[in-house]
UniProtKB/Swiss-Prot annotation:
Gene3D superfamilies: Argininosuccinate synthetase, chain A, domain 2, HUPs. CDD domains: ASS. It catalyses: L-citrulline + L-aspartate + ATP = 2-(N(omega)-L-arginino)succinate + AMP + diphosphate + H(+). The gene is arg12. This is Argininosuccinate synthase. Its main location: cytoplasm. L-citrulline binds at Y88, S93, N124, R128, S181, S190, E269, Y281. PANTHER family: ARGININOSUCCINATE SYNTHASE. It is found in: Cytoplasm. ATP binds at residues 11-19, 37, 116-124. Homotetramer.
Amino acid sequence: MPQEVKRCVLAYSGGLDTSCILAWLIEEGWEVICYMANVGQEEDWDAAREKALKVGAKKVYVEDLREEFINDTVIPAAQANAIYENVYLLGTSLARPIIARRQIQIAEKENCIAVSHGCTGKGNDQVRFELAYYALKPDVQVIAPWRLPVFFERFAGRKDLLEYAAAKGIPVTQTTKKPWSMDENIVHCSYEAGILEDPSMTPPKDMWKLTVDPKDAPDEVEELSIHFEKGAPTKLECKDGTFSGVVSIFYQLNAIARRNGVGRIDIVENRFSGLKSRGCYETPGLTILRTAHMDLEGLTMEREVRALRDQFVTFNLAKILYNGQFFSPCTRMLLAANNVSQEVVNGVVKLSVYKGNVTVLGRKSDTAHLYDEKLSSMDELGGFDPTWTSGFIQIESMRLRNSDEGKHWM
């Protein structure tokens, strides 16, 4: 009897690593379906498809996931003001659940028993992809070549891969390899490894792809306005026109931030594994969006609701996203809580951008009633009785007076 064919879906980029992994999987007896996810990165999709078929892929899927990516992870993260270790806006982390989910959907459609990826054995992405795989399809077989001795002992580095590619007739674009690795999507671009592994080294000017050097940005201030409904952007008004629809808004925010040098960071972060890693990130449009969103929350959200959201949702959602646990009960709970907090976040924020900086110029909301101009005014009482404050201060000071704490501070 003929042996049953083993079928696998490979997350394919068209680069040297995944092209060699494709050939190796075929060599190992797998029938491979290649899958490429368009999450907003620059890519010659037709050339990559042709390359995969030439190497031996049975079929190639090219999936446009940009709108799904923005709606399902980017906007919820922005509504929660999610940020990892106070600086990283999670651009890579946000894309991985969306990419992994479609890979599993294709695996089920094509009756594949396995999925594969080209992530290295030290990074975060292997964890993010595989936790998503197992959450969505617990019985799936995962092939991670860079963790298999049979693979990494054979292919110690780029030289071995190039020799294998030549032997297998895999077309390799002869370009000078940049001394760092990159990952790009509609939200950001990351740079790490190579020369960047020295945390004291200043990144070369030509590394940054998405934004101009702030010193080279225009000398004129550029203004824009972002409209929000329930914490999500619905309209962008700027000198280039009016834009609606999440993908259009993000592309335009990226264009504004790009020409004004907004959204660069250079950090050392803590990976899920405990290793420290140096990363340089450009997150242009999302940096502007987050600034506007946080400002509008100041006008529209009740103080204690915002404090609870900041302490529990913001911190924990960022950690969950970074650690690859998006498809978990915790995420559903956190997003449900955050959705309630965002019901009142409606309005418009006016901003300016200038040489790497984002500044809020004003905000307004037709539905928020927490801010009372007369009640807050220093020029009129507006219904506020100053004598109320005396009792408030007496009550608040009671525990301080009774604590005998003053002796430690005098």
